[in-house]
């Protein structure tokens, strides 16, 4: 068997956005792949029809698409190129029976979504920029004024609201999404939603007479991004907008689905703060009355961690009045259905269903099953694509050995990967990998970095401590960071060492990112059992995180279970920086300079404290990267990151 190489993630092809045609005779999806030489990702559209799979496009930048009709796909692209600064968006159409893609629509603003209408017109979700709200009209003078203003003020940032930046972007500058109507004959856009309100979660009714959407007032200093969004609808004949249902503290709307005879609302009662899972409610289309439909209290969608995904797709869909949805339960994500107020499993296997579509009783699921990267499967669970067979052929893929234990009054679930060429009685070093979130899970899925370490001769252990997803109230860790979760992790580490005497307790290493980075920082201040640690995109100080993260004020107070004023001492007690003078473990810190979720100052603080106390430390910073470095960062940066962590552990082996 050959080992998994450090750059083997570049050989993985990631699938996403699987979508049936209107009549269900074909399906389109995206396939993405990292390109090490060009240090980028390429994405193409693929077609599944009559049991055959073939590439539909070859430009390498196609990811956003929809069906125009049964035989034509519309996708976003830029095949013309721009000689001057431009906000223009272009969409192309391509026939499924062959031929080249043709330019179909050109919009004067950035467009993220289009919804084709039967009359040939479109609904369009596009960007609005404060002070230049009429850019959608295509006035060249206004476009020039926008870019002149941008250039004149490029040395300044004027901040007037929270948050002022978002991870993966830059300073928000107040830009937001609006809903427009596109007249195909006139080639013109008409604004449907008022300026100053951000549109999201747009869904078009099956009869195309009404469009539903969530709306958030972004004209205020602190928009309620985490307070749920109000649901509205517009009658397309009259263009009249109507409030459907409002969010409130005990009814925080996460999303919704359009059924045949009722609208299904997924909303949380806030019992466990901002991470509270949803229950289901029925909303009458005529009266707008809301009634409870089903108590659920589990996660909608997959929160199973993985580093070989690229792209998204549908996590739920109504078929008549039956909701099909992905849900994270325990250590995996499967497909379930809600019918007549009762939830039941549809297709649940070890691993993760990442997205799906359903049409005329047929289903296609994009899933991480059988310790393989993503493939498509049908409604019976039969695999229908083989994109990653060649990548895995002849390679050692460690199979997860489940390890569950009782810690206090609850169970902790986890897994162990054995090193390549494992021999009983021989000693092997161990890497303990801690997930982020904390409301996510590790599961039995193909995880490149873990497989790479197993191929290099390490045991890899990982688990889901208190605070993890998939078990209802188990995820409630508000005000308890560094207590029960730390105890769970140490208990799991002890249990793993007890199960496999081949694990070398003198060569025990630990790493984690985001919440896992917080926990790494906490661990080194509370135990010396690890020979070396690597803290990635971490939190070290809740009192400063409050003011620098894009989610700081909301997330820090929610997770610390208090308000920073007057309870600053509680925030400090839960901060790893408080215990930095206790650290003896050699620690590597990795941060991305454009990570605004766990900003780089968190790494600076911990690194400075350790160096000041004479602890061996190293800080590695990545330009042009954000919080997603390990999952979707530039390929060469991902390789450097993994080399840094692995090299740090190799350097400190006893």
Q: What label would you give each PLM region?
A:
Residues 387-506, 513, 547:
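Cap/lid segment of the alpha/beta-hydrolase catalytic domain
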Residues 37-42, 82-88, 170-175, 222-229, ...:
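Short, solvent-exposed loop/turn segments at conserved positions within beta-propeller repeat blades
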Residues 1-14, 47-63, 85-87, 94-110, ...:
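Multi-bladed beta-propeller domains
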């Amino acid at each position: 068997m050959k080992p998994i190489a450090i750059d083997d993630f570049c050989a993985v092809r990631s699938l996403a956005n699987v979508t049936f045609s209107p009549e269900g005779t074909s399906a389109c999806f995206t396939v993405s792949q990292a390109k090490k030489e060009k240090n980028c990702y390429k994405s193409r559209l693929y077609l599944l029809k009559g049991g055959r799979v073939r590439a539909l496009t070859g430009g390498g930048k196609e990811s956003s698409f929809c069906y125009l009709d049964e035989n034509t796909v519309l996708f976003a692209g830029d095949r013309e190129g721009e000689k001057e600064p431009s906000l223009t968006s272009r969409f192309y159409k391509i026939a499924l029976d062959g031929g080249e893609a043709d330019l179909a629509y050109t919009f004067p603003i950035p467009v993220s979504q289009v919804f084709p209408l039967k009359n040939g017109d479109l609904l369009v979700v596009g960007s609005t920029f404060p002070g230049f709200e009429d850019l959608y009209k295509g006035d060249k003078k206004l476009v020039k004024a926008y870019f002149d203003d941008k250039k004149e003020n490029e040395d300044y940032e004027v901040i007037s609201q929270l948050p002022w930046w978002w991870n993966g972007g830059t300073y928000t500058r107040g830009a937001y999404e609006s809903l427009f109507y596109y007249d195909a004959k006139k080639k013109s856009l008409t604004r449907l939603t008022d300026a100053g309100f951000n549109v999201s979660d747009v869904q078009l009714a099956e009869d195309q007479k009404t469009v539903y959407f969530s709306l958030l007032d972004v004209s205020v200093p602190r928009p309620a991004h985490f307070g749920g969004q109000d649901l509205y609808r517009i009658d397309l004949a009259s263009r009249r907008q109507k409030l459907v249902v409002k969010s409130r503290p005990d009814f925080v709307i996460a999303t919704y689905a359009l059924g045949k005879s009722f609208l299904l609302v997924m909303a949380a009662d806030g019992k466990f703060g901002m991470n509270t899972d949803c229950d289901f409610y029925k909303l009458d289309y005529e009266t707008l009355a809301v009634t409870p439909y089903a108590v659920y209290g589990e996660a909608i969608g997959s929160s199973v961690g993985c580093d070989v995904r690229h792209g998204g797709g549908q996590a739920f869909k109504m078929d008549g009045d039956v909701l099909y949805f992905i849900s994270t339960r325990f250590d995996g994500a499967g497909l379930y259905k809600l019918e007549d107020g009762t939830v039941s499993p549809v297709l649940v296997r070890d691993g993760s269903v990442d997205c799906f579509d359903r049409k005329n009783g047929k289903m296609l699921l994009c899933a991480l099953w059988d310790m393989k990267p993503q493939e498509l499967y049908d409604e019976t669970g039969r695999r229908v694509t083989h994109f990653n067979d060649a990548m895995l052929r002849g390679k050692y893929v460690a199979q997860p050995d489940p390890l569950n234990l009782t810690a206090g009054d609850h169970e902790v679930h986890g897994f162990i990967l054995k090193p390549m060429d494992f021999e009983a009685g021989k000693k092997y070093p161990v890497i303990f990998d801690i997930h982020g979130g904390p409301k996510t899970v590790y599961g039995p899925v193909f995880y490149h970095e873990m497989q790479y370490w197993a191929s290099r001769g390490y045991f890899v252990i990982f688990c889901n401590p208190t605070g993890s997803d998939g078990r209802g109230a188990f995820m409630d860790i508000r005000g308890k960071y560094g207590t029960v979760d730390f105890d769970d992790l140490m208990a799991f580490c002890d249990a793993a060492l007890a199960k496999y005497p081949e694990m070398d307790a003198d060569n025990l290493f630990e790493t984690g990112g985001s919440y896992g980075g917080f926990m790494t920082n906490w661990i080194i201040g509370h135990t010396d059992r690890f020979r070396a640690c690597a803290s990635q995109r971490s939190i070290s100080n809740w009192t400063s995180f409050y003011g620098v993260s894009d989610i700081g004020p909301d997330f820090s107070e929610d997770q610390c279970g208090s308000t920073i004023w007057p309870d600053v001492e509680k925030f400090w007690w839960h901060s790893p920086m408080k215990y930095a003078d206790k650290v003896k473990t050699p620690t590597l810190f990795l941060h991305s300079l454009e990570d605004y979720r766990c900003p780089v100052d968190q790494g600076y603080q911990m690194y400075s404290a350790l160096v000041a106390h004479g602890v061996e430390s190293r800080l590695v910073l990545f330009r042009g990267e954000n919080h997603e470095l390990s999952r979707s960062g530039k390929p060469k940066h991902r390789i450097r990151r993994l080399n840094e962590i692995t090299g740090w552990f190799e350097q400190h082996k006893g």
